[in-house]
Design a protein with these regions (language model features):
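Oligomerization/assembly interface segments of phage tail-like spikes and tubes
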Residues: 46-53, 111
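A sequence-level detector of short, solvent-exposed, charge-rich linear segments
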Residues: 29-36, 86, 90, 128
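C-terminal basic regulatory modules in eukaryotic proteins
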Residues: 6-13, 27-28, 112-113, 118-129
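A short, glycine/Asx- and small/polar-enriched loop/turn
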Residues: 37-47, 92-96
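Extracytosolic low-complexity repeat regions of secreted or lipid-anchored proteins
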Residues: 55-120
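N-terminal leader/targeting segments
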Residues: 1-43, 54-55, 61
Length: 129
């Protein structure tokens, strides 16, 4: 998988996750951000990406369960934490990891792409034109 494919998979997985909730107003918290991963900088890279929206529901546990079930359907290992706020964590599947947080104030979906061959510095230069 190329770095671009890993990034695109991350973005589509995060944004697709938002569609399982009855929530409008989702917006990215910034462009996908490339960085080094693994133990040899310059040889492997991954991206981080976040998406947020104001919650329309107050049933945070039910929304978290919807996200957890969706991620399980993608073949991910899922863990739900309910204190101090409800957070869903997932690893595996099409990305390295994802989290869904219900607070404070906004819903957040954050993810990290798979670690793939590539130089983060060169990828950053390419992304910035």
């Amino acid at each position: 998988m190329s770095p671009e494919q890993a990034r695109d998979t991350l973005v589509s997985t995060v944004e697709e996750t938002s569609t399982v909730l009855d929530v409008s107003g989702w917006a990215w918290t910034g462009a996908p951000e490339v960085g080094n991963c693994g133990d040899r900088p310059g040889e492997r890279a991954n991206d981080n990406y976040g998406y947020s929206a104001p919650p329309q529901s107050r049933d945070f546990a039910a929304d978290a369960q919807k996200v957890a079930e969706h991620w399980k359907s993608l073949g991910m290992e899922v863990r739900v934490v309910d204190s101090p706020s409800v957070v869903v964590y997932a690893t595996g599947g099409p990305v390295e990891g994802l989290s869904f947080s219900t607070g404070p104030g906004n819903y957040y979906i954050f993810g990290t792409s798979l670690c793939v061959p590539g130089d983060a510095s060169e990828l950053r230069k390419k992304d910035n034109g």
